[in-house]
Design a protein with these regions (language model features):
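A broadly conserved detector of short glycine/acidic/proline-rich loop/turn motifs that flank catalytic sites
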Residues: 44, 124-126, 146, 169, ...
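C-terminal helical cap and adjacent loop that interface with cofactors, partners, or active-site loops
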Residues: 157-179
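Substrate-binding/catalytic subdomain of NAD(P)-dependent oxidoreductase enzymes
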Residues: 53-155, 160-162
């Protein structure tokens, strides 16, 4: 973990802990891994294959020599567990987060999504759910997601990260920065 990534994660935690402390967060969705966002963005903007985009990410230093934790979604799942724990004032463990990576996303998938008005982004999604008995639960998951082009997260490019928060009093907020 490099210093810029660690600093970015600390900032995100502080944002959730302090900025929204008095508010009830309903949903947090975000692009929380710069490597996977770079790969998916390169596939969309240049038509590159997954392997070509990964090679470029490695060449530029965005991907590590072993990118498994990034491309399989494990890094994003760890961050989703932290976001859910902080945002919903509960304990969510890494093992509780459903996780799918981007290794099966093809250039054809990207093109079809683009033609339909979507971008594919690896999103960490954490949300408050109401059970039938009236109790609440928190769901956290990471997977490639079709994001409508008009949604702010669709415009997050290269290795940038963004967190989109939906809260009761604050409404919709987006926090954007280097991954």
């Amino acid at each position: 973990l490099d210093r810029s990534s660690a600093a970015s994660d600390v900032y995100k935690r502080q944002m959730l802990r302090r900025s929204l402390a008095g508010d009830q967060v309903e949903r947090i969705s975000g692009i929380v891994n710069g490597t996977t966002n770079f790969i998916l963005d390169a596939m969309e903007s240049t038509g590159a294959s997954y392997d070509e985009a990964l090679a470029e990410a490695t060449r530029l230093g965005y991907a590590e020599a072993d990118p498994t934790a990034d491309v399989e979604g494990h890094d994003a799942a760890s961050k989703a567990a932290i976001m859910a724990s902080l945002g919903f004032h509960t304990r969510v463990k890494f093992e509780d987060v459903h996780c799918e990576g981007i290794t099966k996303v093809t250039a054809a998938d990207i093109a079809a999504a683009n033609d339909a008005g979507y971008s594919i982004k690896l999103l960490a999604i954490c949300e408050r759910l109401q059970r039938e008995d009236g109790s609440e639960a928190v769901n956290a998951r990471v997977h490639p997601t079709l994001v409508p082009k008009e949604h702010p997260l669709a415009s997050v490019s290269e290795s940038y990260n963004a967190i989109f928060v939906e809260a009761e009093a604050a409404g919709s907020l987006m926090f954007y920065g280097n991954g």
